[in-house]
Amino acid sequence: MASENTTETPSVPAGGPLAARISRPEGDANPPSTEAEKPAAEDDSGKGPSIPQVDGASEDQRGSELQDSEFDVNVKLSDLQADPNNPLYSIKSFEELGLAEPIQMGLSKMNFRRPSKIQERALPLLMANPPTNMIAQSQSGTGKTAAFVLNILSRLELTPEKQKSPQALVLAPSRELARQIVGVIQAMGTFVEGLFVATAVPMEMNRNQRVEASIVVGTPGTVQDLIKKRLFNTQHLRVLVLDEADNMLDQQGLGDQCIRVKSLLPRTIQVVLFSATFPDFVVRYAHKFAPNSNQLTLKHEELTVEGIKQLYLDCESDEHKYEILVKFYGLLTIGSSIIFVKTRASAAEIERRMVAEGHTVVSLTGGIEGQKRDEIIDRFRNGTAKVLITTNVLARGIDVSTVSMVINYDIPELHLPGAARRMADAQTYLHRIGRTGRFGRVGVAVSFVSNQEEWQMLQDIQKYFSTNIERVDTRDWDDVEKKVKKIIKPSAVAR
């Protein structure tokens, strides 16, 4: 039976930038801080009804079903002489993996009947012996979390002597994503005897407590502190996973911490990098971090998430953006909604004004710490709060099935000192809108545009993904409501 421990230490000051271009997740004027800032197939017969595989968060965390759209996974093997199309490098069922019975029972309990497309290609490569590194890219909601968790569980040695010695380490950019991953491990490992899981994130427990767990999931700075204080024994580690790897390798501070953590681990460790996006300039760092890797990738055009209707609204000014947002409140609460803003100050101000006007909203940013952050995200997961205002701290990985709408109150943009104009952050846009429109459901992503620069950034995003973002005229509010309700009401009723 899986159990959980939690561990905490203070964060570590961020290091220097890893690349000339650094994207700041909260857009604050001050430099970013450490990780505390960052936040179905058919049944086996082929004839029965769809049995959803829950992805991202476990079912009790209200995770969404799997997004398994038609796309091609491109495979590049570390052994260049091997044929990536060889049947040895693909599976059609979990039974082909020869999983231990307790793990197979966990998959059945989670309604995992058949592997998703990314799992079909990733799992045989991940679980092969001797272990090989992997860099894997796939859309949000396609089973990435389940793939690396399955590999980890299959590699553990849970004898009484080793079950409390860390054998796998998962690094995530935020405490929210770390907690979500722990939920997936515990669900999949329900029947695995002797499994202990520890959460190593800031502000949790006694900072001098030793880590006694088979699997550790944490944020880079906290894990680095634990290792340096000799509270985390790395001797038996077999697998290192970076979830949302492009974000962590790119971000100032987080990237440095990931590199330092890896330098403190056994040289024979299997390194696995997963993300929905891997910009070309980050791929160079990824290959240095995980050398001689098998690589799974998608084209830009295949990354946009199916089932999401993308719209934009012309607003006359920043104040007009707020007025439109308030008008949107009735639509926001049909399901659950996330409003993404650029700065903590914007999040706090919008929350203050909307609450003062009698609306029920909550905000979550990197400035909120520890237990308070957990309480806010839990309220959003269980539906007590239906509208969440946040910065990019929640743009990645967080999976809540009831989210029917995402609002880009501020268009995500790159931090490019000296640039001639503001530049869109297409990768973050994709991660943001991926919080809605999960498998089998329809979602809406609405971007607010209030000036020429923001309009141009949206055009850049459309061009990058070869997609269309439809303009909605805010002068005819009845038409706006009609369009949005037509999209999200059937999905909300289906829930």
UniProtKB/Swiss-Prot annotation:
**A single GO BP annotation from the record?**
protein transport
What keyword terms does UniProt attach to this protein?
A: ATP-binding, Cytoplasm, Helicase, Hydrolase, Membrane, mRNA transport, Nuclear pore complex, Nucleotide-binding, Nucleus, Protein transport, RNA-binding, Translocation, Transport
| One function term, GO molecular function aspect | ATP hydrolysis activity
Q: Where is the composition biased (Polar residues)?
A: 1-10
Places the protein is found: Cytoplasm; Nucleus, Nuclear pore complex; Nucleus membrane
Catalysed transformations (reactions) = ATP + H2O = ADP + phosphate + H(+)
Which residues does the UniProt record annotate as the domain Helicase ATP-binding? 125-296
Binding positions (ATP): S138, Q139, S140, G141, T142, G143, K144, T145
Span(s) of short sequence motif DEAD box = 243-246
User: Which GO cellular component terms, listed alphabetically, does the Swiss-Prot or TrEMBL entry include?
Assistant: cytoplasm; nuclear membrane; nuclear pore
Region described as Disordered: spans on this chain: 1-68
Compositional bias per record (Basic and acidic residues), positions renumbered to this chain: 35-46
Concerning Pfam families, the annotation shows: DEAD (PF00270), Helicase_C (PF00271)
* Record bears the keyword DNA-binding: no
Limits of the Helicase C-terminal domain: 307-488
What are its E.C. numbers?
3.6.4.13
Return the similarity comment.
Answer: Belongs to the DEAD box helicase family. DDX19/DBP5 subfamily.
Tell me the PANTHER family matching this sequence.
Answer: ATP-DEPENDENT RNA HELICASE DBP3 (PTHR47958)
Domain remarks in the Swiss-Prot or TrEMBL record: The Q motif is unique to and characteristic of the DEAD box family of RNA helicases and controls ATP binding and hydrolysis.
Role according to the record: ATP-dependent RNA helicase associated with the nuclear pore complex and essential for mRNA export from the nucleus. May participate in a terminal step of mRNA export through the removal of proteins that accompany mRNA through the nucleopore complex. May also be involved in early transcription.
- Assembly, per entry: Associates with the nuclear pore complex.
For this entry, the protein name equals ATP-dependent RNA helicase DBP5
Q: Which organism is it from?
A: Coccidioides immitis (strain RS)
